[in-house]
Amino acid sequence: MLEISSKTNLLEKNSYKYSLQDVAEPNLQRDVYSYGTVPKVAFNHRRVPLNMPEEIWITDTSLRDGQQSVEPYTVEQIVNIYKLLSRLGGPYGIIRQTEFFVYSKKDRQALEKCMELGLKFPEITSWIRASKEDFKLVRDLGIRETGILVSCSDYHIFKKMKMTRSQVLDYYLGTVKDAFDAGVIPRCHLEDITRADFYGFVVPFVNELQALSRQAGIPVKIRACDTMGYGVPYTEAALPRSVAGIIYGLQHYSDVPSECLEWHGHNDFCKAVANASTAWLYGACAVNCSLLGIGERTGNIPLEAMVFEYASLRGSLDGMDPTVITEIACLLYTSPSPRDA
C-alpha cells in the first residue's frame, strides 16, 4: 500500500511502518558493544540528507543532569544560575528551556523561586521517571511541560526495568497518558538510544506516542539521549550509533517534527559537541546542554560551546550575551559548596 509522506510529499510504501518486535531475550548488540574491546563504529554507506530546521535552540540540564555529578546546589545557587541562563540566552530565548528535579522539598522550593521571577526564558520544566507517583508531583506544581524518562535499550528494559519490550511500552504509555489528561506536554527522554533496537523498539514506541498525541491534541516531544556517549557524527555510519541516522529515522519513520525533536549527549568519547551540531544539521531543533559541560562521568554537551556553534551556523548570536559565560564560570568555580554555605 502506498501513501503520501507528509515529510517528502512523495508516495512511499507503508512497509516502512515498523511494528514492535517483542523479543524473548535482550539484543545487547555485542558485535558493536563487546565488554572486552572499545565500542566499534560500523558503516552501511547510506547517506541521509541535511535538514537544518528554520529555527534552532538550546535547552539546559545544568540543574538536573549537572547536579548529578556535583554536590547539590543550594536554592540561592539555583536561582542565580537560572538568572544567568536567562541573560546568556537573550531576549529571543535561544536558551529556550531548563529542567528541574521535583523530588525533594528543596528542589520544589528552588523551582518555585525561579518561577516567581517571571522570566520568559528559559522556560521552567521538570524531569521525572515514568511513574504515576512521580507525575503527581508535576501536576501539583502546575508545570506546563515535563521530561519523562523512558529507557529504550534492551540493557535498560530487560536488566534495569526487568520487563519485556511490550510490558515496558505499556508502562511508559500509562504515564504519558496521565500527562495528556492533565494538559501537560510530555517530553519523552529515550534513554540509551545509541544502544537500542531502533526499528524493533524505538520507532514503534515513538509511533505509539505520536498516536496518543494526535488523540489528545497535545504535542509530544522526543529527546534522543546518547546516554553513554556512543553516538558518532560520521557520514554513512550505521545505526544505532549514527546521530544523523537517529534524527532522520525519528522524522521519517515516526513523523516527529523538528520542533519536537531534541538531542541529549554525553562526552565519554569526546564527541558531545560534534554530535550536537550534527543533530541540528540533520533536523533536530533543540540540543540539550549543561553549563561548562558539568554532568555525569565525563560530562554533558557544554552549553557555552553550543552558543558559539549556534553563532557559527546561523551567522549571528541572535541576542545571546556570551560575556555572561565568565560570570557563570566564576559562580560555579568559586561558590561555596552546600555543605560549607
Located regions from the model:
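Alpha/beta enzyme core
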Residues: 76-93, 132, 136-148, 153-155, ...
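N-terminal capping/small domains of soluble enzymes
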Residues: 2-132
